[in-house]
A protein has these predicted regions:
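Long, well-ordered, tryptophan-enriched scaffold segments
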Residues: 1-186
Length: 187
């Protein structure tokens, strides 16, 4: 899964927006990766408490026989890929997510937990996981507060709730909730 992969955030309009995946080539000495470091995505390892290049990214496809796989390893060591840094974050920042509803803001700002890391130029960067970005984009309140977080399914003022969708589509919020639960039950 891509969920633990770290994404660089860049400053935008007083907050941040997602930029691209953090790569070994972004970090000091390519994080020890000599072959294709610009194609090796990075995760945070709970065991070593550090950023690592896990087996399986496209950078391992050529030139490193046996490392293009889905084993939870980096450098021959077992790793535990962190899904979310929530609770261990360095900071909470406001991240803007694209929003395409007419007559509403182009960006929805939501709080996201982040880690700070120094790049190869010794500049501080903010990074977070794909998972943390996706959950924030959905508007799920994980106790982080901030703008655009629904208090309930019936909150029609926050994008993507059933009540909000009912205003746009005409489909009853209760039907949207039921359909969502049925999909979840069958997943």
């Amino acid at each position: 899964t891509d969920m633990p992969i770290q994404v660089i955030l860049r400053k935008h309009e007083g907050g941040f927006v997602s930029d691209r995946c953090l790569r070994a080539s972004d970090l000091n000495e390519n994080l020890g990766e000599k072959n294709n470091p610009e194609w090796k995505t990075i995760v945070y390892d709970n065991k070593s408490k550090s950023f690592v290049a896990p087996n399986g990214s496209i950078g391992f496809r050529w030139g490193e026989e046996g490392k293009w796989n889905l084993l939870h390893q980096s450098g021959g060591q077992e790793i535990d890929q962190e899904l979310s840094c929530l609770g261990n974050q360095d900071e909470l920042v406001s991240v803007g997510f694209p929003h395409f509803t007419p007559n509403e803001s182009d960006l929805l700002w939501r709080n996201v937990p982040v880690r700070k890391v120094k790049n190869a130029k010794n500049e501080e960067m903010y990074v977070t996981s794909v998972f943390d970005l996706q959950v924030a984009n959905y508007g799920i309140d994980r106790g982080l507060g901030g703008e655009n977080v629904a208090q309930s399914y019936s909150d029609s003022s926050v994008a993507y709730t059933p009540a909000w969708a009912e205003k746009i589509t005409g489909v009853k919020a209760a039907d949207i909730e039921r359909t969502g639960r049925e999909f979840a039950d069958n997943a």
